[in-house]
Amino acid sequence: MSLLTEVETYVLSIVPSGPLKAEIAQRLEDVFAGKNTDLEALMEWLKTRPILSPLTKGILGFVFTLTVPSERGLQRRRFVQNALNGNGDPNNMDRAVKLYRKLKREITFHGAKEIALSYSAGALASCMGLIYNRMGAVTTEVAFGLVCATCEQIADSQHRSHRQMVITTNPLIRHENRMVLASTTAKAMEQMAGSSEQAAEAMEVASQARQMVQAMRAIGTHPSSSAGLKSDLLENLQAYQKRMGVQMQRFK
């Protein structure tokens, strides 16, 4: 796996699923391929994206700044600086300085990542802030190692939280989660269906599913009534893909 592929993988792992994630993935691909060279426009676009947490925006801004060639005097962006200040916690800043001193002696991506993984996400973000604000300088490879370690820490905590929700025995939470997933799947079906003649059927199934979820929420239904909703939708989506000549493995 190439360095940039690895960076893209880690960064995208902390972005919530949805149309925005696909858009960010495309921007990262363009930046890494040298196709997008207007850092100012890129940062302005990032600043106004909804849904993303300030820290995720800060990490993306840091990656864009590392990758896109820019004029030396280009102003640092406040939204990135604020996100990478470790919540203003002096302990984070102390640890960040110690980490920076170690990273300065490191020259490889994997070496930097290994060192950084023993620090908290707050200290890692503060260390990125030091480098972003030009208060410290490391090689691009080392900076990318720091980025990936930070993303791994964040993704780990997100995964723990997600797993807790998946294994919860609370029937109301499970019921709502199934309805949310069914609704999201229906939305994806509508986007994939496009404008072909066979699309009408897929669109109809997706539309009915969304109406059903709305009705279930409006009248309040038994928690077991949502079981299998998403699976039924995915079976319909696969049947549609087969007719279109698209052979894809099951979405799970």
Curated annotation (Swiss-Prot):
Entry-linked InterPro entries: Flu_matrix_M1, Flu_matrix_M1_C, Flu_matrix_M1_N, Flu_matrix_M1_N_sub1, Flu_matrix_M1_N_sub2, INFV_M1
Membrane-protein topology: Peripheral membrane protein
Location(s) in or outside the cell: Virion membrane; Host nucleus
Chief place of localization: virion
Lineage of origin: Viruses, Riboviria, Orthornavirae, Negarnaviricota, Polyploviricotina
Disulphide bonds in the chain: none
Database matches in Pfam families: Flu_M1, Flu_M1_C
Subunit structure, interactors included: Homodimer and homomultimer. Interacts with NEP. Binds ribonucleocapsid by both interacting with genomic RNA and NP protein. May interact with HA and NA. Cannot bind NP without genomic RNA.
Listed name of the protein: Matrix protein 1
Function per UniProt: Plays critical roles in virus replication, from virus entry and uncoating to assembly and budding of the virus particle. M1 binding to ribonucleocapsids (RNPs) in nucleus seems to inhibit viral transcription. Interaction of viral NEP with M1-RNP is thought to promote nuclear export of the complex, which is targeted to the virion assembly site at the apical plasma membrane in polarized epithelial cells. Interactions with NA and HA may bring M1, a non-raft-associated protein, into lipid rafts. Forms a continuous shell on the inner side of the lipid bilayer in virion, where it binds the RNP. Determines the virion's shape: spherical or filamentous. Clinical isolates of influenza are characterized by the presence of significant proportion of filamentous virions, whereas after multiple passage on eggs or cell culture, virions have only spherical morphology. Filamentous virions are thought to be important to infect neighboring cells, and spherical virions more suited to spread through aerosol between hosts organisms.
GO MF term set: RNA binding; structural constituent of virion
Domain of life: Viruses
Gene3D superfamilies named in the record: 1.10.10.180, 1.20.91.10
Gene name linked to the record: M
Source organism: Influenza A virus (strain A/Leningrad/134/17/1957 H2N2)
Region (Membrane-binding): 1-164
Regions that span the bilayer: none
Family: Belongs to the influenza viruses Matrix protein M1 family.
Keyword GTP-binding listed: no
GO-annotated cellular components: host cell nucleus; membrane; virion membrane
Motif Nuclear localization signal: where in chain: 101-105
Misc remark: Most abundant protein in virion. When expressed alone can form virus-like particles in transfected cells.
Keyword annotations: Host nucleus, Membrane, RNA-binding, Viral matrix protein, Virion
